[in-house]
Structures are given as C-alpha cells and as structure tokens.
Amino acid sequence: MSLFPSLHLLLLIVMTASHTETENCEDIQNTCLVISCDSPGINGLPGKDGLDGAKGEKGEPGQGLIGLQGLPGMVGPQGSPGIPGLPGLKGQKGDSGIDPGNSLANLRSELDNIKKWLIFAQGKQVGKKLYLTNGKKMSFNGVKALCAQFQASVATPTNSRENQAIQELAGTEAFLGITDEYTEGQFVDLTGKRVRYQNWNDGEPNNADSAEHCVEILKDGKWNDIFCSSQLSAVCEFPA
C-alpha cells in the first residue's frame, strides 16, 4: 500500500481540527478567557515582588571571626569567707628563750654587787638608805642639782644612826637637805615636811645676818644654820 494517501489524510485531519478550534474561540470570545491557539510567545518582564512569607525556623549560628577582647569589668562585691585551710607543717625548733625571771634576778644580783662596792669604796648604808659622796664642795643649789641628776636627794637624817653615817662619810662640813628659806625658823626637808629629828649645836640656829637658811652638819655631827651660797661637801641619799 502506498504511504502518500495516508499522509494526505493526516494533513487533512490536522487542518480540519485547527479550523474547528478557531471557530470555537471566536464564538466564545465574549464569554471566556482567550486561549492562544497559536504557538507560545516571548516571555514577558518579571512581575512585582510578592508578599513576605511566614517567618522561618531559627538557623544554626554562623562561623564568624572572633571579636576583640572587651575591657575588664568592675570589681565585684567581696565574697563570703572561705573554709579554713588545713594546718601547716610543723616548723623548725626555735632557739631557747630567755627567762625574764632569771634575767631580773641576775640584774638584781649585779645591782647588789655594785651597791656593795659603792658602800665599801665611798658610801654608807643605814637601814633602807644609802649615802654617797664625791668629795667635792659646792653650794646648796649645786648639791641639789648633783643629787637630782642621779635620782637622789640631799642627805637628810631622820635619826641618830643616819646622822652618824653622814658625819662619818663626809668627814667635814656638808649640806643637809633641810632649810627654812620659806618660813623663818620652820625647818623642813626638801619635800616640804617639817623635820622631827634635830641635832643643833649650842646656840643654833641663830640666823646670823638674817640670811642663814640652809643647814650644815659639822665634823662632830652637830647642826648649824649657814648661808646657802657656802661651799660645802655634797652627800646624796639613795633608797637602798
């Protein structure tokens, strides 16, 4: 059988269908959308952006570069005390300490030895009093200053034993710590107390020239009022 009749028949069918479809489109142009029956045209321009879609789920953190280190923050409040630590290791044995009791006893012993030496060399002790002299002569004020320098006072006998010790130690005239320079005729010691023990020489005190306000012990142990500016031996009295 020849193929040409079949090709003619197929072409006729296609042309008939195209014609029929064109007529149908013309009939319904006023009542329906136009359907292009021709081959596709060129693509048009892009349309406007549509509305934003719904928010998507949170994505994974990106791997950006590490930023610069920030400035140090302010000092925070002081925290609560911590738990006490464990005891430390035992230290090395220290040197032996000095017993204050022994040191004080040794010091007292040395002072006693010095006192004995002073008494033997140039002093006299009677009861709780120690009398010392340097053998120099000076005014009453000079004697007071000398004795005060050594935290002592001018020798002041309160009984015959003390009076004799001062007499023997001085060996010559010496000032006593007695005066009436504040009230004439009222002899007091250097603390202002009125003296009870007295050993005046005959006719004394006589306040010659109304200016004898100090007291000296004579070689025989008797007392005599004398000028305070006189130069006599210095005898100081220390507590023993």
UniProtKB/Swiss-Prot annotation:
Xref: SMART domains: CLECT
Residues annotated with Hydroxyproline modification: 46, 72, 81, 87
Tissue: Expressed in liver. Weakly expressed in kidney and testis.
GO molecular-function terms, A-Z: D-mannose binding
Gene Ontology CC entries for this record: collagen trimer; extracellular space; multivesicular body
Coiled coil: 104-122
Record's keyword annotation contains Signal: yes
UniProt xrefs under SUPFAM superfamilies: C-type lectin-like
Signal peptide: 1-18
GO annotation, biological process: complement activation, classical pathway; complement activation, lectin pathway; positive regulation of phagocytosis; surfactant homeostasis
Residues covered by the Collagen-like domain: 39-61, 67-97
C-type lectin domain: residues covered: 126-237
InterPro entries for this protein: C-type_lectin-like (IPR001304), C-type_lectin-like/link_sf (IPR016186), C-type_lectin_CS (IPR018378), Ca-dependent_lectin (IPR051077), Collagen (IPR008160), CTDL_fold (IPR016187)
Subcellular location: Secreted
Chief localization: secreted
Region (Disordered): 48-102
Key words, A-Z: Calcium, Coiled coil, Collagen, Complement activation lectin pathway, Complement pathway, Disulfide bond, Hydroxylation, Immunity, Innate immunity, Lectin, Mannose-binding, Repeat, Secreted, Signal
Compositionally skewed regions (Basic and acidic residues) per UniProt: 49-60
Assembly and oligomerization: Interacts with MASP1 and MASP2. Interacts with MEP1A and MEP1B and may inhibit their catalytic activity. Forms oligomeric complexes of 2 or 3 homotrimers.
Record comment regarding domains: The coiled-coil domain mediates trimerization.
Chain's role: Calcium-dependent lectin involved in innate immune defense. Binds mannose, fucose and N-acetylglucosamine on different microorganisms and activates the lectin complement pathway. Binds to late apoptotic cells, as well as to apoptotic blebs and to necrotic cells, but not to early apoptotic cells, facilitating their uptake by macrophages. According to some authors, it only binds mannose.
Protein name: Mannose-binding protein C
Annotated organism of origin: Sus scrofa (Pig)
